[in-house]
Amino acid sequence: MKKLKASEIRQKYLDFFVEKGHMVEPSAPLVPIDDDTLLWINSGVATLKKYFDGRETPKKPRIVNSQKAIRTNDIENVGFTARHHTFFEMLGNFSIGDYFKQEAIEFAWEFLTSDKWMGMEPDKLYVTIHPEDMEAYNIWHKDIGLEESRIIRIEGNFWDIGEGPSGPNTEIFYDRGEAYGQDDPAEEMYPGGENERYLEVWNLVFSEFNHNKDHSYTPLPNKNIDTGMGLERMASVSQNVRTNYETDLFMPIMNEIEKVSGKQYLVNNEQDVAFKVIADHIRTIAFAISDGALPANEGRGYVLRRLLRRAVRFSQTLGINEPFMYKLVDIVADIMEPYYPNVKEKADFIKRVIKSEEERFHETLEDGLAILNELIKKAKATTNEINGKDAFKLYDTYGFPIELTEEIAVQAGLKVDMTTFESEMQQQRDRARQARQNSQSMQVQSEVLKNITSASTFVGYDTATAQTTLTHLIYNGEEVSQVEAGETVYFMLTETPFYAISGGQVADTGIVYNDNFEIAVSEVTKAPNGQNLHKGVVQFGQVNVGATVSAEVNQNDRRDIQKNHSATHLLHAALKSVLGDHVNQAGSLVEADRLRFDFSHFGPMTNDEIDQVERLVNEEIWKGIDVNIQEMDIASAKEMGAMALFGEKYGDVVRVVNMAPFSIELCGGIHVRNTSEIGLFKIVSESGTGAGVRRIEALTGKAAFLYLEDIQEKFNTMKSQLKVKSDDQVVDKLTQLQDEEKALLKQLEQRDKEITSLKMGNIEDQVEEINGYKVLVTEVDVPNAKAIRSTMDDFKSKLQDTIIILASNVDDKVSMVATVPKSLTNNVKAGDLIKQMAPIVGGKGGGRPDMAQGGGTQPENISKSLSFIKDYIKNL
């Protein structure tokens, strides 16, 4: 058999099937497109469903691909086995109603055994078939010439996922020899058994039956072929290594981990687990981020966060206690190009995301692990189960994925009370949902609304007024025929100019009236059957069903909403231009007085980036671009480059808002006719709303002008107070004052140190020897919390081999700080000292092994805490 690099195997596979008339289907992104049934692309066939189910017809019925995939159903096994992965590549050849078993088997045999391709020894190959699949048996035995003893019948060789296409399959195994085990049926040492000797290298699925609702099977009119070969596994066979992790897909990563950790791979089984976890997870994380996913608290983002934090936890077992996963991204990129250039192209962005996430987790990891270890001790002494409320606190406060807590618990021989954990999670979801609920929204999503099916046409794209008929009135949750003045009512119209809240754009407000009554409209939403449902208060008169009315939108607000919505599109495009294509809309709010835009990005924008975005948007406004709005089919919209919002669902016909060439986006909202109508755009804030999500708030038109006018007024006031004549002198004067303040503060700090030193006397005389350690434990009189740290720095410079613990009372609040020489941190940890002391003074604290700080609210107990910590050190 040829010894080939993984990249060579991939290319040979594609080349072989191209020779056999197959079309190469490029590897699709890991984040599924137009398929809400999948969290990730998890197989080679997942991206081809559109061909198999008939939605699209491929250019050729023969297809070959190498598809990157993610599976996360058994993350806890990754690292502990030879071949479990969360990220992998699946090589596959497919036939959509073209060739079937004969060709599929012959192709597989030729690719594996021909010297031109893999060059495997035929006498080392075995196959499994379904017991009733005589056609496959005859092909293998009579046409290929495989001995009967190397064809194993296994009942499980039938691919079936319930109702739909199904069929038998045949698997091909490679015998790695007696070094991997002696033949012994009792130990499943046979092809198809759980063993390391006979490795499955290819699975050929023959989709020939339809699994019917009554569980009967009928032949399919068009038979299909679906095969899968794991690249990592084939590489391990070709390169003759024991596990996938020793192939050229992983070893460069292992080598880098060895350099960083100082530990060796393949020397210690326990260490090897950590090596494998880190190597597997960094591949998954790098590829997922390159394809548009970001760490978050739910969905696929939660999977990434869980993987990264699991890898960080295992890296600690190798002595790596700082962010380093991001440094592996370049190695992954080098291994996987040129077939996957995306990781290298986005490497800087991927590294920034990973480093940011690592830093966040490291901030809480030590405290979280310390708490978890205490919970484990408590559980072992009582119920052998970690309390669900405690597990939830670890998740909520310290960022520990519950799966990570479970995994550590299992390693300690314990379990987690998941029932209580889920209850706590549900309570949190309920609280969040309650907080999001609009108190003004209609709470009558009842059978009343569901039973109203009469049409209501929105005409507001073209007009802000309409002559229409009031068709339904709902009062106190019931449909009625009339409502009196002063009452709040919900109603529908045959035609309405009022936009219903949707896509981040708020609803229109206005009035609906005739000579007999008037309703002030405050809210418009979508009813269950799609009609616009208006809410308002009857200002005067009696409202009757069937009344002919005038409907008028508040046009001032409408114009401002239009400006803000069109500006939001320009902002989205500008962010992509300045920050990169990874930017996706994560939420928006378009109101009359402001706009808010949430987007995916790994960290705060710089002032320069904000300025660039703002300038780009204003340039498009000043160009006076016509805003063309058209309805078309989704395919035509995508062809013209229209941007679809990530995660949004669209029908067959979509509305395209075109401000070409800068912005083309699918949108159902209301917009200006020309960008010049927006007038002016000003960003007023940029902030974070969660991991990987940033928020911009901005103003347009008159609101932006008034905002700048207010800033100018404040600037003039400041200029007057600084007593300078020109605008240019303001910054110079401020810099001068800041420098003077720093100098004065430095003088004051030095004087405080001198006063403290005089009060303390000779500190060397106060050092005690406790349990073999030099220790200084004392209360200091300082003017503020910052001064206690500077006092500590002063003491450390004089007592370099001494454990120092200081406490102070500042404004009836306790501040404490501890330092331990690095040479002693294996035995004494500053963080532990503070954690022991802080509760005594009614507080908490912690930190690194060499430096920690804390505080409390009970200064009367300072002496008690200092005495306690001396005894604590004495008993270490």
Curated annotation (Swiss-Prot):
What this protein needs as a cofactor is:
Zn(2+)
Free-text cofactor note = Binds 1 zinc ion per subunit.
Q: What is its main location?
A: cytoplasm
For this UniProt entry, which residues form the secretion signal? none
- Cellular localization per UniProt: Cytoplasm
What CDD domains does the database record attribute to this sequence?
A: AlaRS_core
| UniProt binding sites for Zn(2+) | 565, 569, 667, 671
Keyword set includes Zinc: yes
Q: Which Enzyme Commission number(s) are listed?
A: 6.1.1.7
The catalytic activity, as recorded, is: tRNA(Ala) + L-alanine + ATP = L-alanyl-tRNA(Ala) + AMP + diphosphate
Give the record's keywords alphabetically. Aminoacyl-tRNA synthetase, ATP-binding, Cytoplasm, Ligase, Metal-binding, Nucleotide-binding, Protein biosynthesis, RNA-binding, tRNA-binding, Zinc
Q: Which GO terms describe its biological process?
A: alanyl-tRNA aminoacylation
**MF GO annotations:** alanine-tRNA ligase activity; aminoacyl-tRNA deacylase activity; ATP binding; catalytic activity, acting on a protein; transferase activity; tRNA binding; zinc ion binding
- Does the UniProt entry include the keyword Oxidoreductase? no
Tell me which domain of life the UniProt entry assigns to the organism this sequence originates from.
Bacteria
A Gene Ontology cellular-component term: cytosol
What family does this chain come from, according to its entry?
Belongs to the class-II aminoacyl-tRNA synthetase family.
Task: Tell me, in a sentence or two, what this protein's role is.
Answer: Catalyzes the attachment of alanine to tRNA(Ala) in a two-step reaction: alanine is first activated by ATP to form Ala-AMP and then transferred to the acceptor end of tRNA(Ala). Also edits incorrectly charged Ser-tRNA(Ala) and Gly-tRNA(Ala) via its editing domain.
Q: What is known of its domains?
A: Consists of three domains; the N-terminal catalytic domain, the editing domain and the C-terminal C-Ala domain. The editing domain removes incorrectly charged amino acids, while the C-Ala domain, along with tRNA(Ala), serves as a bridge to cooperatively bring together the editing and aminoacylation centers thus stimulating deacylation of misacylated tRNAs.
Q: What is this protein called?
A: Alanine--tRNA ligase
- UniProt source species: Staphylococcus aureus (strain NCTC 8325 / PS 47)
